[in-house]
Regions:
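Jelly-roll (double-stranded beta-helix
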Residues: 1-288
Length: 288
């Protein structure tokens, strides 16, 4: 018998702000006080229209240490280049999973053709914490294509994409340091889906767009909302009142101290000071 994870609240995203000149984002957490350990932050960008341009928009060279960035492209395309020698482009449906760990410098810019032609841009960026034991490990880059992500067709006509973790026997392609589940879920109007999630995981239902009833009690309706869920319980029931686009995340809590400063997330303020010093001294490398 399944036990539903409790809805801990419902929250709308913060006001729109720009990251660089290419990403108009709304923050879903932690700006509203939501804590979903091991996840640190979730920004939702778009949908926004960009006019054709000659120069790629985005965020230029900047550092990270101590965590992972996960970027999911829904519309538009983004190029990535980092000081560890990794580069790639993610197109609609693709995922970029970058492990900053001991430190990288990277840039994120609109891809050349998207820059030239313009169009609708929509993406999500999620920050995933690393345990203390892995914070200074070697940086890693996973460019995951749409074709590599398993798709589960649901009985009501919707589907679920398994980006990380396991759902209904299907394993996601992303390699993670701790137990993390990340699912893209599309539900058709009138569809009901009881989604299993591990007992002991923190979790959240993120609404990109639509109207969904959670566990028969709480509603997310509109665009860019989040409902954090309890650790206790092993399922969440989703009922779509309209065509609905969701992102479901769950993870085993790391439960370690978190010290953050801008692009660095460590365990102590001393480690943050060292990260700043290492970056300024060029120890995280430079873009060629």
């Amino acid at each position: 018998m399944t036990t539903q994870k409790k809805v801990l609240g419902t929250y709308s995203a913060g006001s729109n702000h720009w990251v660089g000149d290419g990403f108009p984002v709304r923050n879903l957490f932690p700006s509203n006080g939501v804590d979903v350990d091991p996840f640190l932050m979730l920004d939702y960008a778009g949908p926004s229209r960009f006019e054709p341009a000659k120069k790629p928009r985005g965020v230029g060279e900047h550092p990270h240490r101590g965590f992972e960035t996960v970027t999911i492209a829904y519309q538009g395309s983004v190029g990535h280049r980092d000081s560890a020698g990794n580069s790639g482009v993610i197109y609609p449906g693709d995922v970029q999973w970058m492990t900053a760990a001991s430190g990288v410098v990277h840039e994120e810019l609109h891809e050349a053709e998207f820059t030239k032609n313009g169009g609708i841009f929509e993406m999500v960026q999620l920050w995933v914490n690393l345990p203390k034991a892995q914070k200074m490990s070697k940086p890693r880059y996973q460019g995951i294509t749409k074709a590599q992500i398993p798709v589960i067709e649901l009985e009501g006509g919707g589907h679920a994409r398994v980006i990380a973790g396991e759902l209904l026997g299907r394993l996601g392609p992303a390699k993670t340091f701790t137990q993390v589940n990340l699912f893209d879920v599309i539900l058709k109007a009138g569809e009901r889906f009881e989604l299993p999630l591990p007992d002991g995981h923190n979790a959240a239902v993120v609404l990109r767009k639509g109207d969904v009833l959670i566990n028969g009690t709480d509603t997310l309706s509109g665009e860019a909302l989040i409902a954090p869920l309890s650790e206790e319980g092993d399922a969440v029931t989703l009922e779509a009142k309209a065509d609905t686009q969701l992102l479901i995340l769950s993870g085993e809590p790391i439960a370690e101290p978190v010290a953050s400063y801008g692009p660095f997330v460590m365990n102590t303020h001393e480690e943050l000071a060292q990260a700043v010093e290492d970056y300024r001294a060029g120890r995280m490398g430079h873009l060629a």
